[in-house]
Protein backbone atom coordinates (compact mmCIF):
# COMPACT_ATOMS: atom_id res chain seq x y z
CA UNK A 1 0.00 0.00 0.00
CA UNK A 2 1.29 3.46 -0.80
CA UNK A 3 1.86 5.94 1.98
CA UNK A 4 -1.22 8.14 2.30
CA UNK A 5 -1.70 11.23 4.44
CA UNK A 6 -4.88 11.46 6.49
CA UNK A 7 -6.27 14.32 8.57
CA UNK A 8 -8.87 13.61 11.25
CA UNK A 9 -10.83 16.68 12.36
CA UNK A 10 -13.26 16.69 15.29
CA UNK A 11 -13.71 19.28 18.02
CA UNK A 12 -14.58 16.62 20.65
CA UNK A 13 -11.28 15.15 21.95
CA UNK A 14 -12.71 11.73 22.87
CA UNK A 15 -14.42 11.34 19.49
CA UNK A 16 -11.29 12.50 17.68
CA UNK A 17 -9.34 9.80 19.51
CA UNK A 18 -11.97 7.14 18.64
CA UNK A 19 -11.70 7.97 14.93
CA UNK A 20 -7.89 7.95 15.04
CA UNK A 21 -7.95 4.55 16.77
CA UNK A 22 -10.27 3.18 14.06
CA UNK A 23 -7.84 4.37 11.39
CA UNK A 24 -4.92 2.80 13.26
CA UNK A 25 -6.75 -0.53 13.60
CA UNK A 26 -7.44 -0.49 9.87
CA UNK A 27 -3.86 0.51 9.03
CA UNK A 28 -2.13 -2.72 10.09
CA UNK A 29 0.70 -2.23 7.57
CA UNK A 30 1.54 1.33 8.61
CA UNK A 31 0.66 2.86 5.26
CA UNK A 32 -0.95 6.02 6.65
CA UNK A 33 0.44 9.22 8.14
CA UNK A 34 -2.29 10.55 10.45
CA UNK A 35 -2.63 14.12 11.75
CA UNK A 36 -5.26 15.34 14.21
CA UNK A 37 -7.13 18.63 14.11
CA UNK A 38 -9.58 19.95 16.70
CA UNK A 39 -10.42 22.99 14.56
CA UNK A 40 -11.57 22.91 10.95
CA UNK A 41 -10.37 26.49 10.37
CA UNK A 42 -6.79 25.47 11.17
CA UNK A 43 -7.07 22.47 8.82
CA UNK A 44 -8.48 24.64 6.03
CA UNK A 45 -5.71 27.21 6.51
CA UNK A 46 -3.04 24.49 6.34
CA UNK A 47 -4.54 23.18 3.09
CA UNK A 48 -5.09 26.56 1.43
CA UNK A 49 -1.60 27.80 2.30
CA UNK A 50 -0.20 24.42 1.19
CA UNK A 51 1.51 23.87 4.53
CA UNK A 52 -0.03 20.41 4.49
CA UNK A 53 -1.27 18.06 1.78
CA UNK A 54 -3.69 15.26 2.60
CA UNK A 55 -5.15 12.42 0.58
CA UNK A 56 -8.13 11.91 2.91
CA UNK A 57 -10.01 13.98 5.47
CA UNK A 58 -12.20 12.39 8.11
CA UNK A 59 -14.41 15.32 9.15
CA UNK A 60 -17.03 15.92 11.78
CA UNK A 61 -19.86 18.10 10.49
CA UNK A 62 -20.92 19.87 13.66
CA UNK A 63 -17.92 21.92 14.73
CA UNK A 64 -17.37 25.64 15.21
CA UNK A 65 -15.90 25.53 11.69
CA UNK A 66 -18.66 23.63 9.90
CA UNK A 67 -17.50 20.43 8.19
CA UNK A 68 -19.85 20.97 5.21
CA UNK A 69 -18.48 24.43 4.53
CA UNK A 70 -14.92 23.14 4.84
CA UNK A 71 -15.57 20.31 2.37
CA UNK A 72 -17.34 22.63 -0.09
CA UNK A 73 -14.42 25.07 0.02
CA UNK A 74 -11.99 22.23 -0.70
CA UNK A 75 -13.85 21.16 -3.84
CA UNK A 76 -12.82 24.49 -5.39
CA UNK A 77 -9.13 23.61 -5.06
CA UNK A 78 -7.41 22.10 -8.13
CA UNK A 79 -6.39 18.99 -6.20
CA UNK A 80 -8.44 18.27 -3.15
CA UNK A 81 -8.51 15.32 -0.77
CA UNK A 82 -11.25 12.74 -0.49
CA UNK A 83 -13.64 13.47 2.38
CA UNK A 84 -15.45 11.09 4.70
CA UNK A 85 -17.93 12.77 7.01
CA UNK A 86 -18.03 11.17 10.46
CA UNK A 87 -20.93 12.59 12.47
CA UNK A 88 -23.66 11.80 14.99
CA UNK A 89 -26.37 13.21 12.73
CA UNK A 90 -28.26 10.94 10.30
CA UNK A 91 -30.25 13.78 8.78
CA UNK A 92 -27.27 15.25 6.92
CA UNK A 93 -26.57 12.06 4.97
CA UNK A 94 -28.21 13.05 1.66
CA UNK A 95 -26.54 16.46 1.66
CA UNK A 96 -23.28 14.83 2.79
CA UNK A 97 -23.13 12.41 -0.12
CA UNK A 98 -23.32 15.36 -2.49
CA UNK A 99 -19.95 16.55 -1.19
CA UNK A 100 -18.16 13.63 0.42
CA UNK A 101 -16.79 10.30 -0.73
CA UNK A 102 -18.54 8.54 2.18
CA UNK A 103 -20.78 9.42 5.15
CA UNK A 104 -20.46 7.51 8.43
CA UNK A 105 -22.46 7.86 11.64
CA UNK A 106 -20.94 7.84 15.14
CA UNK A 107 -20.33 5.69 17.01
CA UNK A 108 -18.42 4.07 14.16
CA UNK A 109 -19.49 0.62 13.04
CA UNK A 110 -16.13 -1.08 12.35
CA UNK A 111 -17.41 -3.09 9.37
CA UNK A 112 -18.84 0.04 7.70
CA UNK A 113 -15.63 1.93 8.50
CA UNK A 114 -13.53 -0.87 7.01
CA UNK A 115 -15.66 -0.89 3.84
CA UNK A 116 -15.31 2.89 3.52
CA UNK A 117 -11.53 2.73 4.02
CA UNK A 118 -11.23 -0.13 1.50
CA UNK A 119 -13.02 2.09 -1.03
CA UNK A 120 -10.71 5.01 -0.18
CA UNK A 121 -7.57 2.92 -0.65
CA UNK A 122 -8.87 1.56 -3.95
CA UNK A 123 -9.68 5.09 -5.16
CA UNK A 124 -6.32 6.51 -4.05
CA UNK A 125 -4.39 3.57 -5.51
CA UNK A 126 -6.05 4.23 -8.87
CA UNK A 127 -4.78 7.83 -8.74
CA UNK A 128 -1.14 6.89 -8.12
CA UNK A 129 1.50 5.13 -10.20
CA UNK A 130 4.21 3.73 -7.93
CA UNK A 131 7.58 3.08 -9.55
CA UNK A 132 11.18 2.38 -8.60
CA UNK A 133 13.40 5.22 -9.78
CA UNK A 134 17.12 5.55 -9.03
CA UNK A 135 16.88 3.31 -5.98
CA UNK A 136 13.85 5.05 -4.47
CA UNK A 137 10.12 4.39 -4.61
CA UNK A 138 8.19 7.22 -6.26
CA UNK A 139 4.44 7.68 -6.20
CA UNK A 140 3.32 9.72 -9.20
CA UNK A 141 -0.19 11.11 -9.42
CA UNK A 142 -1.71 9.69 -12.59
CA UNK A 143 -3.27 13.09 -13.35
CA UNK A 144 0.28 14.53 -13.61
CA UNK A 145 1.30 11.99 -16.27
CA UNK A 146 0.81 13.17 -19.86
CA UNK A 147 2.01 10.08 -21.72
CA UNK A 148 4.49 7.20 -21.70
CA UNK A 149 6.65 6.12 -24.61
CA UNK A 150 8.73 3.01 -25.13
CA UNK A 151 12.46 3.23 -25.86
CA UNK A 152 13.83 -0.29 -26.17
CA UNK A 153 13.60 -1.90 -22.73
CA UNK A 154 12.81 1.39 -21.03
CA UNK A 155 9.80 3.66 -20.72
CA UNK A 156 10.00 7.44 -20.79
CA UNK A 157 7.26 8.97 -18.64
CA UNK A 158 6.35 12.56 -19.53
CA UNK A 159 4.88 14.28 -16.47
CA UNK A 160 3.69 17.75 -15.60
CA UNK A 161 6.91 18.70 -13.77
CA UNK A 162 9.48 16.17 -14.99
CA UNK A 163 10.35 13.35 -17.36
CA UNK A 164 11.49 9.99 -15.96
CA UNK A 165 13.15 7.05 -17.68
CA UNK A 166 12.36 3.67 -16.11
CA UNK A 167 13.37 0.12 -16.80
CA UNK A 168 10.00 -1.41 -17.69
CA UNK A 169 7.83 -2.22 -20.68
CA UNK A 170 4.63 -0.47 -21.80
CA UNK A 171 2.45 -3.55 -20.98
CA UNK A 172 3.89 -3.59 -17.44
CA UNK A 173 3.05 0.10 -17.01
CA UNK A 174 -0.47 -0.44 -18.37
CA UNK A 175 -1.07 -3.13 -15.73
CA UNK A 176 -0.47 -0.58 -12.97
CA UNK A 177 -2.29 2.40 -14.48
CA UNK A 178 -6.06 2.94 -14.36
CA UNK A 179 -7.36 1.58 -17.67
CA UNK A 180 -10.22 4.08 -17.78
CA UNK A 181 -7.66 6.91 -18.02
CA UNK A 182 -4.94 5.54 -20.31
CA UNK A 183 -5.20 4.45 -23.94
CA UNK A 184 -2.62 2.93 -26.25
CA UNK A 185 -2.88 4.48 -29.74
CA UNK A 186 0.28 2.55 -30.70
CA UNK A 187 2.16 -0.32 -29.05
CA UNK A 188 4.93 2.10 -28.04
CA UNK A 189 2.71 4.70 -26.35
CA UNK A 190 0.25 5.14 -23.50
CA UNK A 191 -1.66 8.41 -23.43
CA UNK A 192 -3.50 9.89 -20.46
CA UNK A 193 -6.99 10.62 -21.81
CA UNK A 194 -7.44 13.42 -19.25
CA UNK A 195 -4.90 15.51 -21.19
CA UNK A 196 -6.39 15.10 -24.66
CA UNK A 197 -7.98 18.29 -25.94
CA UNK A 198 -10.79 17.84 -28.46
List each language-model region with its residue ranges.
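Acidic phosphotransfer microenvironment of two-component signaling modules
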Residues: 13, 38-42
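Conserved binding/recognition cores within well-folded domains
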Residues: 115-198
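CheY-like receiver
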Residues: 25, 29-31, 42-126
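Short loop/edge segments at beta-strand edges and connector loops
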Residues: 38, 105-106, 168
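Short, flexible loop segments at the rims of nucleotide/cofactor-binding pockets, characterized by
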Residues: 35, 60-63, 159-162
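Conserved beta-strand scaffold positions in the cores of enzyme catalytic domains, especially
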Residues: 34-36, 103, 182
